[in-house]
Protein backbone atom coordinates (compact mmCIF):
# COMPACT_ATOMS: atom_id res chain seq x y z
CA UNK A 1 0.00 0.00 0.00
CA UNK A 2 1.16 3.51 -0.82
CA UNK A 3 0.20 6.52 1.28
CA UNK A 4 0.49 9.92 -0.39
CA UNK A 5 0.27 12.77 2.13
CA UNK A 6 -0.51 16.17 0.64
CA UNK A 7 -0.68 19.47 2.57
CA UNK A 8 -4.34 20.20 1.87
CA UNK A 9 -7.44 19.16 -0.05
CA UNK A 10 -6.62 21.13 -3.21
CA UNK A 11 -3.22 19.47 -3.57
CA UNK A 12 -4.72 16.07 -2.77
CA UNK A 13 -7.26 16.62 -5.55
CA UNK A 14 -4.60 17.70 -8.05
CA UNK A 15 -2.39 14.71 -7.25
CA UNK A 16 -5.30 12.31 -7.68
CA UNK A 17 -6.40 13.87 -10.98
CA UNK A 18 -2.86 13.81 -12.32
CA UNK A 19 -2.60 10.13 -11.41
CA UNK A 20 -5.82 9.31 -13.26
CA UNK A 21 -4.57 11.20 -16.31
CA UNK A 22 -1.21 9.42 -16.13
CA UNK A 23 -2.84 5.98 -15.98
CA UNK A 24 -5.15 6.71 -18.90
CA UNK A 25 -2.27 8.05 -20.99
CA UNK A 26 -0.13 5.02 -20.16
CA UNK A 27 -2.93 2.65 -21.19
CA UNK A 28 -3.42 4.50 -24.51
CA UNK A 29 -7.04 3.30 -24.70
CA UNK A 30 -8.86 2.66 -27.96
CA UNK A 31 -12.44 1.82 -28.88
CA UNK A 32 -11.43 -1.84 -28.97
CA UNK A 33 -9.49 -1.69 -25.69
CA UNK A 34 -10.92 1.06 -23.48
CA UNK A 35 -9.71 2.13 -20.05
CA UNK A 36 -12.19 1.13 -17.34
CA UNK A 37 -12.55 3.52 -14.42
CA UNK A 38 -14.47 3.03 -11.17
CA UNK A 39 -15.80 6.28 -9.72
CA UNK A 40 -17.12 7.54 -6.37
CA UNK A 41 -19.47 10.28 -5.26
CA UNK A 42 -19.53 12.33 -2.06
CA UNK A 43 -17.51 15.39 -1.15
CA UNK A 44 -14.01 13.87 -1.37
CA UNK A 45 -13.75 13.47 -5.18
CA UNK A 46 -15.28 16.83 -6.14
CA UNK A 47 -11.90 18.58 -6.31
CA UNK A 48 -10.43 15.76 -8.38
CA UNK A 49 -13.38 15.94 -10.78
CA UNK A 50 -12.87 19.68 -11.11
CA UNK A 51 -9.23 19.10 -12.08
CA UNK A 52 -10.18 16.38 -14.57
CA UNK A 53 -12.76 18.65 -16.21
CA UNK A 54 -10.15 21.40 -16.49
CA UNK A 55 -7.61 19.01 -18.01
CA UNK A 56 -10.17 17.72 -20.53
CA UNK A 57 -11.16 21.24 -21.59
CA UNK A 58 -7.48 22.13 -22.02
CA UNK A 59 -6.95 19.11 -24.25
CA UNK A 60 -4.67 17.31 -21.79
CA UNK A 61 -6.87 14.21 -21.55
CA UNK A 62 -9.72 12.58 -23.43
CA UNK A 63 -12.37 10.29 -21.98
CA UNK A 64 -13.67 9.17 -25.37
CA UNK A 65 -12.27 5.67 -24.87
CA UNK A 66 -12.95 5.45 -21.13
CA UNK A 67 -15.72 3.34 -19.62
CA UNK A 68 -16.93 4.22 -16.13
CA UNK A 69 -18.69 2.29 -13.39
CA UNK A 70 -19.92 4.16 -10.36
CA UNK A 71 -19.72 2.66 -6.90
CA UNK A 72 -23.28 3.09 -5.70
CA UNK A 73 -26.72 4.68 -5.90
CA UNK A 74 -29.58 5.25 -3.49
CA UNK A 75 -32.63 3.00 -3.66
CA UNK A 76 -35.90 4.76 -4.46
CA UNK A 77 -34.46 8.20 -5.24
CA UNK A 78 -35.48 9.46 -8.68
CA UNK A 79 -32.60 9.70 -11.14
CA UNK A 80 -33.41 13.37 -11.73
CA UNK A 81 -33.35 14.16 -7.99
CA UNK A 82 -30.49 16.64 -7.39
CA UNK A 83 -28.93 14.33 -4.78
CA UNK A 84 -29.09 11.14 -6.80
CA UNK A 85 -25.67 9.91 -7.78
CA UNK A 86 -26.74 10.07 -11.42
CA UNK A 87 -27.29 13.82 -10.98
CA UNK A 88 -24.08 14.22 -8.98
CA UNK A 89 -21.91 12.59 -11.62
CA UNK A 90 -23.38 14.55 -14.50
CA UNK A 91 -23.17 17.80 -12.55
CA UNK A 92 -19.56 17.37 -11.48
CA UNK A 93 -18.02 15.38 -14.32
CA UNK A 94 -19.91 13.75 -17.18
CA UNK A 95 -21.60 16.87 -18.57
CA UNK A 96 -18.22 18.60 -18.90
CA UNK A 97 -16.02 15.96 -20.53
CA UNK A 98 -15.99 14.06 -23.83
CA UNK A 99 -17.13 10.70 -22.48
CA UNK A 100 -19.59 8.76 -24.64
CA UNK A 101 -23.00 8.36 -22.95
CA UNK A 102 -23.06 4.62 -23.63
CA UNK A 103 -19.82 4.25 -21.67
CA UNK A 104 -21.34 5.56 -18.43
CA UNK A 105 -22.62 2.94 -15.98
CA UNK A 106 -24.46 3.80 -12.76
CA UNK A 107 -26.60 1.43 -10.74
CA UNK A 108 -30.36 1.96 -11.08
CA UNK A 109 -31.87 2.26 -7.62
CA UNK A 110 -35.36 2.23 -9.13
CA UNK A 111 -35.00 -1.01 -11.07
CA UNK A 112 -38.03 -3.33 -10.73
CA UNK A 113 -35.73 -6.17 -9.61
CA UNK A 114 -32.87 -4.77 -7.55
CA UNK A 115 -31.09 -8.10 -7.16
CA UNK A 116 -31.13 -8.62 -10.93
CA UNK A 117 -29.80 -5.07 -11.37
CA UNK A 118 -26.86 -5.84 -9.08
CA UNK A 119 -26.09 -9.13 -10.83
CA UNK A 120 -26.22 -7.42 -14.23
CA UNK A 121 -23.80 -4.75 -12.99
CA UNK A 122 -21.24 -7.40 -12.04
CA UNK A 123 -21.62 -8.99 -15.47
CA UNK A 124 -21.18 -5.61 -17.18
CA UNK A 125 -17.93 -5.01 -15.31
CA UNK A 126 -16.69 -8.43 -16.33
CA UNK A 127 -17.74 -7.86 -19.95
CA UNK A 128 -15.77 -4.59 -19.99
CA UNK A 129 -12.64 -6.50 -19.04
CA UNK A 130 -12.63 -5.59 -15.36
CA UNK A 131 -11.84 -2.26 -13.77
CA UNK A 132 -8.38 -0.81 -14.38
CA UNK A 133 -8.52 1.84 -11.66
CA UNK A 134 -11.17 2.05 -8.97
CA UNK A 135 -11.30 5.38 -7.13
CA UNK A 136 -13.14 5.73 -3.84
CA UNK A 137 -13.60 7.70 -0.68
CA UNK A 138 -14.31 6.50 2.84
CA UNK A 139 -16.73 7.38 5.59
CA UNK A 140 -15.74 8.26 9.17
CA UNK A 141 -16.45 4.62 10.09
CA UNK A 142 -14.14 3.37 7.35
CA UNK A 143 -16.83 2.22 4.94
CA UNK A 144 -15.90 2.13 1.28
CA UNK A 145 -18.76 2.64 -1.18
CA UNK A 146 -21.77 1.64 0.95
CA UNK A 147 -20.00 -1.36 2.46
CA UNK A 148 -20.87 -0.51 6.03
CA UNK A 149 -19.10 -2.00 9.08
CA UNK A 150 -19.72 -5.73 9.20
CA UNK A 151 -19.81 -6.14 5.42
CA UNK A 152 -18.10 -9.21 4.03
CA UNK A 153 -14.70 -8.44 2.57
CA UNK A 154 -15.56 -10.74 -0.35
CA UNK A 155 -18.97 -9.13 -1.01
CA UNK A 156 -20.26 -8.35 -4.49
CA UNK A 157 -22.69 -5.73 -5.81
CA UNK A 158 -25.86 -5.88 -3.73
CA UNK A 159 -28.54 -4.02 -1.74
CA UNK A 160 -27.39 -2.54 1.58
CA UNK A 161 -29.24 -0.96 4.48
CA UNK A 162 -27.45 2.21 5.55
CA UNK A 163 -26.34 2.69 9.14
CA UNK A 164 -27.64 5.56 11.24
CA UNK A 165 -24.15 7.10 11.14
CA UNK A 166 -24.16 7.11 7.34
CA UNK A 167 -27.68 8.52 7.18
CA UNK A 168 -26.66 11.29 9.58
CA UNK A 169 -23.48 12.02 7.61
CA UNK A 170 -25.36 12.17 4.30
CA UNK A 171 -28.16 14.31 5.68
CA UNK A 172 -25.98 17.36 4.97
CA UNK A 173 -26.94 16.85 1.32
CA UNK A 174 -30.65 16.69 2.22
CA UNK A 175 -31.14 19.95 4.15
CA UNK A 176 -29.88 18.18 7.30
CA UNK A 177 -33.13 16.23 7.39
CA UNK A 178 -32.49 12.52 8.00
CA UNK A 179 -36.06 11.73 6.96
CA UNK A 180 -35.19 12.72 3.39
CA UNK A 181 -32.13 10.45 3.20
CA UNK A 182 -32.83 7.06 1.57
CA UNK A 183 -32.24 4.20 3.99
CA UNK A 184 -31.06 1.68 1.39
CA UNK A 185 -28.60 1.76 -1.47
CA UNK A 186 -27.15 -0.41 -4.20
CA UNK A 187 -23.39 -0.72 -3.88
CA UNK A 188 -20.48 -2.56 -5.40
CA UNK A 189 -19.00 -5.02 -2.93
CA UNK A 190 -15.63 -4.98 -1.24
CA UNK A 191 -14.73 -7.95 -3.42
CA UNK A 192 -15.80 -6.02 -6.52
CA UNK A 193 -13.43 -3.21 -5.61
CA UNK A 194 -10.61 -5.59 -4.72
CA UNK A 195 -10.87 -7.19 -8.17
CA UNK A 196 -9.76 -3.90 -9.78
CA UNK A 197 -6.21 -3.84 -11.06
CA UNK A 198 -5.57 -0.66 -9.06
CA UNK A 199 -7.45 1.06 -6.24
CA UNK A 200 -6.99 4.70 -5.19
CA UNK A 201 -8.77 6.02 -2.10
CA UNK A 202 -9.15 9.73 -1.26
CA UNK A 203 -9.19 10.68 2.43
CA UNK A 204 -9.48 14.26 3.63
CA UNK A 205 -10.28 16.05 6.86
CA UNK A 206 -10.11 15.41 10.59
CA UNK A 207 -13.35 13.43 10.58
CA UNK A 208 -11.65 10.68 8.54
CA UNK A 209 -8.53 10.50 10.74
CA UNK A 210 -9.56 7.44 12.72
CA UNK A 211 -10.58 5.61 9.56
CA UNK A 212 -7.21 6.41 7.97
CA UNK A 213 -5.41 5.13 11.06
CA UNK A 214 -7.31 1.84 10.88
CA UNK A 215 -6.71 1.58 7.13
CA UNK A 216 -2.95 1.95 7.48
CA UNK A 217 -2.10 0.71 10.97
CA UNK A 218 -5.05 -1.48 11.98
CA UNK A 219 -5.75 -5.15 11.44
CA UNK A 220 -7.80 -6.28 8.46
CA UNK A 221 -11.39 -6.39 9.71
CA UNK A 222 -14.91 -6.43 8.32
CA UNK A 223 -15.73 -3.75 10.91
CA UNK A 224 -13.45 -1.35 8.98
CA UNK A 225 -14.01 -2.36 5.38
CA UNK A 226 -11.31 0.03 4.15
CA UNK A 227 -8.73 -2.26 5.80
CA UNK A 228 -9.24 -4.78 2.98
CA UNK A 229 -7.05 -2.43 0.95
CA UNK A 230 -4.03 -3.80 2.84
CA UNK A 231 -4.49 -7.03 0.88
CA UNK A 232 -4.66 -5.39 -2.54
CA UNK A 233 -1.67 -5.82 -4.83
CA UNK A 234 -1.67 -2.19 -6.02
CA UNK A 235 -3.42 0.29 -3.76
CA UNK A 236 -2.90 3.97 -3.00
CA UNK A 237 -4.39 6.20 -0.34
CA UNK A 238 -4.13 9.92 -1.07
CA UNK A 239 -4.79 12.06 2.00
CA UNK A 240 -4.29 15.52 3.42
CA UNK A 241 -2.46 16.51 6.60
CA UNK A 242 -5.72 16.91 8.51
CA UNK A 243 -6.54 13.23 8.00
CA UNK A 244 -3.18 12.16 9.46
CA UNK A 245 -3.65 13.43 13.01
CA UNK A 246 -4.21 9.94 14.46
CA UNK A 247 -1.33 8.22 12.66
CA UNK A 248 1.73 7.26 14.68
CA UNK A 249 4.61 9.67 14.17
CA UNK A 250 6.73 6.82 12.85
CA UNK A 251 4.07 5.82 10.32
CA UNK A 252 3.64 9.40 9.14
CA UNK A 253 7.40 9.96 8.77
CA UNK A 254 7.90 6.63 7.01
CA UNK A 255 5.44 7.38 4.23
CA UNK A 256 6.57 10.99 3.89
CA UNK A 257 10.11 9.68 3.43
CA UNK A 258 9.49 6.94 0.89
CA UNK A 259 7.09 9.06 -1.19
CA UNK A 260 9.11 12.30 -0.99
CA UNK A 261 9.88 12.23 -4.72
CA UNK A 262 6.22 11.65 -5.64
CA UNK A 263 4.60 14.57 -3.81
Curated annotation (Swiss-Prot):
Pathway: Amino-sugar metabolism; N-acetylneuraminate degradation; D-fructose 6-phosphate from N-acetylneuraminate: step 5/5
A GO term for molecular function: identical protein binding
Domain of life: Bacteria
Catalyses which reaction(s): alpha-D-glucosamine 6-phosphate + H2O = beta-D-fructose 6-phosphate + NH4(+)
This protein's record includes keyword Hydrolase: yes
Biological processes per GO annotation: carbohydrate metabolic process; glucosamine catabolic process; N-acetylglucosamine catabolic process; N-acetylneuraminate catabolic process
The keyword Magnesium is annotated on this UniProt entry: no
Pfam families to which the protein is assigned, alphabetical: Glucosamine_iso
Active-site residue list: 72, 141, 143, 148
GO CC terms of this entry: cytoplasm
InterPro entries: Glc/Gal-6P_isomerase, Glucosamine6P_isomerase, Glucosamine6P_isomerase_CS, NagB/RpiA_transferase-like
EC number: 3.5.99.6
Keyword field: Allosteric enzyme, Carbohydrate metabolism, Hydrolase
Site residues, Part of the allosteric site: 151, 158, 160-161, 254
Protein family (similarity comment): Belongs to the glucosamine/galactosamine-6-phosphate isomerase family. NagB subfamily.
The protein's role, per its UniProt record: Catalyzes the reversible isomerization-deamination of glucosamine 6-phosphate (GlcN6P) to form fructose 6-phosphate (Fru6P) and ammonium ion.
HAMAP family: GlcN6P_deamin
Annotated NCBIfam families: nagB
Name listed for the protein in its UniProt record: Glucosamine-6-phosphate deaminase
Species in which this protein is naturally found: Porphyromonas gingivalis (strain ATCC BAA-308 / W83)
Amino acid sequence: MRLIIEPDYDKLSKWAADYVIERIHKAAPTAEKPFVLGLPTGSSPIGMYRELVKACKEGCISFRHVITFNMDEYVGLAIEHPESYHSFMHRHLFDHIDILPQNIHILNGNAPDLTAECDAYERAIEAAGGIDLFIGGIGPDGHIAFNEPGSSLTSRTRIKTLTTDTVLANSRFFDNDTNQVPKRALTVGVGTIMDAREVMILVNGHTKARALREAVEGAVSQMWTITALQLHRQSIIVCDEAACVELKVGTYNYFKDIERNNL
